[in-house]
Amino acid sequence: MRGGTSAPDVLKMLLAKDPSRDVRQVAMIDARGRVAAHTGAKDIPAAGHITGTNFSVQANLMLNDTVWPAMAKAFTSAKGDLADRMMAALDAAQAAGGDIRGRQSAALIVVTGKPTGKPWSDRVFDLRVDDSAEPLKELHRLLVLQRAYNHMNAGDLAVENKDNDGALREYSAAAALVPDNLEMVYWHAVALVNMGRVDQSLPLFRRVFRADKNWLTLTPRLAKVGLLPSDQAVLGRILKAAD
């Protein structure tokens, strides 16, 4: 496919020389949105797939044969970004009966449409739950958390680009998603200080310090390595927020 061969042609070639094709299940989509899928005749029932515009859903070892149609319907009708739509498909699969063996694991990977050559930044979401009684519930939690971290990272980048207002919008968006995450509140406060907005930072520091004194211990260390101003008056005001 990297050389331009379509997904259907690639799958056809692979299956033609695969002696175990009857027990395979595979789906692929190329950069032009051409979709190909295969469910082997000897895959353990219930097994099957549905392809549509820019997507494929497939399943095997399901409780019943309504699972993948439910996935397709959910994916095509769900609102939101790609991650939201994929989660909707997974939720629908479970609601329709899911894996006959029960619930154990779930994963979600979303990459950018235009690779930059930096795999670590091209992966928008790379989440997995390897063993849980409620894997989809945990995956939902991780997705929200990762969205918040993505906002924090965007805020840090905005700070580097001297876009303070943009940074604060990103930090606020992160806080709205995970309001109880003390680390995000703390680094938001640190960013405010470095923008010269010490007064705005103090309520955030106060909240963090009162919840966990370790952040109070950490704060002078940041000043020593240049991540907070070395001005003792400023540092004193920050530390006093713990009172």
List the predicted regions and their residue ranges:
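Residue-level recognition of tetratricopeptide repeat
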Residues: 156-157, 190, 224
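Alpha/propeptide regions of enzymes that mature by internal proteolysis
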Residues: 1-101, 108, 130-161, 176
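Canonical tetratricopeptide repeat
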Residues: 153, 187, 221-222
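Short coil turns that delineate tetratricopeptide repeat
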Residues: 179, 210-214
